Amino acid sequence: MSNEVVLKEENKLEINFNPYELALVKGDLSKLSDVERASYVKNLCESLSLNMLTKPFEYIVLNGKLTLYANKSATDQLRQIRKVSITKTEVAQVGDIYMVTAYAATPDGRTDCDTGALNIKNLGGDNLANAIMKAITKAKRRVTLSICGLGMLDESELETIKEKRFL
């Protein structure tokens, strides 16, 4: 792979990545053809031992970049394949924010934790119960991705992002 390096005005260096490098380095899949995108997703699934037929990743346009996010299928499979255990959860409420911290461990002794938080202002009854369950789910999915070394969005985080478009 070769990058085109161009010296721009005011001695600013610009690197023009080819489409596959953009996907790998910048996380932008928009310049890939349909076939290249399918290949990228297939390779990602294979590298993580995920079943591609279960659609563990979905596309989203975020900040002008076409990217992938991990859905429930991805995090459920990752927990099973990597034998990730959610060892405990802790709950806290700060003002109108309901926070759940999930702790995870792997058989080799690695541990991690991550938090899911939701605004519960003006919620009651079933809406409050659903928000609490969402915060738990968000924390568990986030810690799963984290302990597996994947710095990517999961679907439980998407509703709080305003500038997004699903494909």
What are the language-model segments listed below?
Residues 2-167:
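Polyanion-binding surfaces on beta-sheet-dominated domains and ring/shell assemblies
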